[in-house]
């Protein structure tokens, strides 16, 4: 591996958003907005429409061996789902994993170098939902 500049956490996040953006376009979603600087605890990173469905997309990106995880907690999860519901939208989670393709070991594959190719892991979308009995705010959230 060469000594190249590294991607920042924001660069990695933006790359994950770009990956999901391109996939949604392939799947016939019309992207209405994409915002790498959206507050991850309260705002979606992308809003899109397909047929009659408006959807908010929460996107997280991680470097090998990990993947993007929702780590903001239950309160943020519920806030994001409620925010989508208030706008008549569905809410989806997209987890993206990146591995430096120049790497041959786990350590090398975890280095987010600029200007290299990456192996991408994206298994699709997971709908973020709250159980029907969350009116009292005590029920746990569900990802289906």
Write out the residue ranges for each language-model feature:
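Hydrophobic transmembrane alpha-helix bundles
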Residues: 1, 66-82, 126-140
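Acidic-basic catalytic patches of nuclease active cores, encompassing PD-(D/E)XK
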Residues: 1-35
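Amphipathic coiled-coil/heptad-repeat helices and related helical stalk/stem segments
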Residues: 17, 42, 73-77
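A short beta-turn/loop motif at secondary-structure boundaries
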Residues: 36-40
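Short acidic loop-to-beta-strand element that houses the catalytic metal-binding Asp/Glu
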Residues: 43-48
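Catalytic cores of nucleic-acid endonucleases
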Residues: 49, 53-113
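Glycine-rich, aromatic-bearing surface loops/beta-hairpins
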Residues: 110-144
């Amino acid at each position: 591996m060469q000594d190249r500049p590294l991607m920042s956490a924001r660069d990695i996040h933006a790359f994950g958003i770009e990956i999901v953006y391109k996939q949604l376009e392939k799947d016939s979603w019309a992207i209405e907005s994409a915002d790498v600087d959206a507050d991850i605890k309260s705002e979606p990173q992308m809003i899109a429409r397909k047929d009659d469905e408006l959807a908010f997309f929460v996107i997280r990106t991680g470097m090998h061996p990990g993947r993007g995880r929702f780590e903001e907690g239950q309160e943020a999860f519920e806030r994001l789902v409620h925010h989508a519901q208030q706008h008549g939208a569905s809410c989806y989670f997209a987890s993206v994993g990146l591995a430096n393709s120049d790497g041959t070991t786990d350590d090398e594959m975890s280095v987010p170098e600029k200007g290299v190719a990456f192996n991408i892991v994206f298994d699709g979308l997971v709908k973020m939902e709250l159980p029907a009995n969350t009116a009292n705010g005590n029920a746990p959230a569900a990802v289906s």
